From Swiss-Prot:
<dbReference type="GO" id="GO:0042840">
    <property type="term" value="P:D-glucuronate catabolic process"/>
</dbReference>
<dbReference type="GO" id="GO:0008927">
    <property type="term" value="F:mannonate dehydratase activity"/>
</dbReference>
<dbReference type="InterPro" id="IPR004628">
    <property type="entry name" value="Man_deHydtase"/>
</dbReference>
<dbReference type="GO" id="GO:0030145">
    <property type="term" value="F:manganese ion binding"/>
</dbReference>
<dbReference type="InterPro" id="IPR036237">
    <property type="entry name" value="Xyl_isomerase-like_sf"/>
</dbReference>
<dbReference type="Pfam" id="PF03786">
    <property type="entry name" value="UxuA"/>
</dbReference>
<keyword id="KW-0456">Lyase</keyword>
<protein>
    <recommendedName>
        <fullName>Mannonate dehydratase</fullName>
        <ecNumber>4.2.1.8</ecNumber>
    </recommendedName>
</protein>
<comment type="function">
    <text>Catalyzes the dehydration of D-mannonate.</text>
</comment>
<comment type="pathway">
    <text>Carbohydrate metabolism; pentose and glucuronate interconversion.</text>
</comment>
<keyword id="KW-0464">Manganese</keyword>
<comment type="similarity">
    <text>Belongs to the mannonate dehydratase family.</text>
</comment>
<dbReference type="GO" id="GO:0008198">
    <property type="term" value="F:ferrous iron binding"/>
</dbReference>
<keyword id="KW-0408">Iron</keyword>
């Protein structure tokens, strides 16, 4: 397993010196300054590679080349944006970068309601509160027919949340949901958000699948020609929200993706925190079923609460994810690949660490403070080493 670290570029509060000291050898990054849909020029890619190389690091995984909303809705200039995506893939491959993580979530990327959830030990975590989200949909956004997505009890609790909330609480919740979290390339005002939602009025799960299939049939052949691996990130949370369909949430979705364009270059990012929110997702089974297609891993854990649709980010070895079993399955796949002649380790990054210790007094990107991720990477590294010594000595 290759130890990597997500870095948001020159403005990231976590420096590349910090990344190197954490023990990572690879960096997961993107050219966030290039507008969605535009081609990533070779010169800009090489410029970023040079910055990393100066610190003894390599650009291991692109996360992400954003998929333009026109592509997801199959409207507007979608053909132009697809052609640009194809060229960006070619340019990355020209520079020796062979793995691209992306997602196909409508409008929003990953979604949370609380970015400073207090843990019992005093650290802060990210949280998705189903009731707060219902309050946003029903009483702030006022999405038509949203009531159908919530039980009568949830609607009552959401009304109480809204009635008890201050103006500051409402503004903060709204900002957390629609203003854009780290990695998201777009933020919205409420009116802009309502307009975006309206664009999906006639797009159900089957139509979104058709739109994604069109995209994949256009870009996977380019990836094959370039030797580049695509790794789709799952929906976060892995279920429909805001009346929007989600199509990368379950093992059935993974099977559909595999069959739609059956190519080793059409692969997956195994994000244990995203998939793991659903109790019916067996993470080890997913890795075993699609091991040859898993090109990148995000290792973190989440913990479901009394309302199973509410969850918070747990410690990396805690929560509802059996991280030891997950790492075991990844190492088993690495060993299989090694026997087949593929010596490349599967890159992993510690995802969404708690804000703790000295980082509590710093301005950080939510979920991406240094110390919490350092702790997570050290813990996963320990699990990996123990398993290698006990079960996979040839991987040492």
């Amino acid at each position: 397993m290759e130890q990597t670290w997500r870095w948001y570029g020159p403005n990231d509060p976590v420096s590349l010196d910090d990344v190197r000291q954490a023990g990572a050898t690879g960096v997961v990054t993107a050219l966030h300054h290039i507008p969605n849909g535009e081609v990533w020029p070779v010169e800009e890619i090489k410029k970023r590679q040079a910055v990393l190389a100066d610190k003894g690091l390599t650009w291991s995984v692109v996360e992400s080349i954003p998929v333009h909303e026109d592509i997801k809705t199959h409207s507007g200039q979608f053909e132009t944006w697809i052609a640009n995506y194809q060229q960006s893939i070619r340019n990355l491959a020209t520079c020796g970068i062979d793995t691209v993580c992306y997602n196909f979530m409508p409008i929003l990327d990953w979604t949370r309601t609380d970015l400073e959830y207090q843990m019992p030990d005093g650290s802060r975590a990210l949280r998705f509160d189903q009731i707060a989200f219902a309050a946003f949909e029903l009483h702030i956004l006022k999405r038509p027919s949203a009531e159908a997505d919530y039980s009568a009890e949830e609607q009552q609790q959401a009304l109480k949340w809204f009635e008890d909330a201050s103006d500051a609480d409402i503004e903060k919740l709204t900002r957390n949901i629609i203003a854009g979290l780290p990695g998201a390339e777009e933020g919205y005002t409420l009116d802009q958000f309502r307009a975006r939602l309206a664009e999906y009025g006639d797009i159900d799960k089957n139509q979104l699948r058709e739109n994604m299939a069109y995209f994949l049939r256009a870009i996977v052949p380019v990836a094959e020609a370039c030797g580049l691996r695509l790794a789709v990130h799952p929906d976060d949370p892995p279920r429909p929200i805001l009346g929007l369909p989600r199509i990368v949430s379950t093992i059935e979705d993974m099977q559909w993706l595999k069959e739609t364009v059956d190519s080793i270059n059409n692969g997956f990012t195994m994000c244990t925190g995203s998939y793991g929110v659903r109790e019916d997702n067996d993470l080890v089974k997913m890795i075993e079923a699609f091991g040859d297609r898993i090109h990148f891993t995000h290792l973190r854990a989440t913990c479901r609460e009394n309302n199973p649709k509410t969850f918070h980010e747990a410690a990396h070895l805690g929560g509802d994810v059996n991280m030891v079993a997950v790492v075991d399955a990844i190492l088993s796949e690495e060993q299989r690949r090694k026997h087949a002649g593929d010596m490349r380790p599967i890159p992993f990054r510690p995802d969404h660490g708690h804000q703790m210790l000295d980082d509590l007094r710093k301005k950080t990107n939510p979920g991406y403070s240094a110390i919490g991720r350092l702790k997570g990477m050290a813990e996963v590294r320990g699990v990996e080493l123990a398993l290698k010594m006990l079960k996979y000595p040839e991987l040492l």
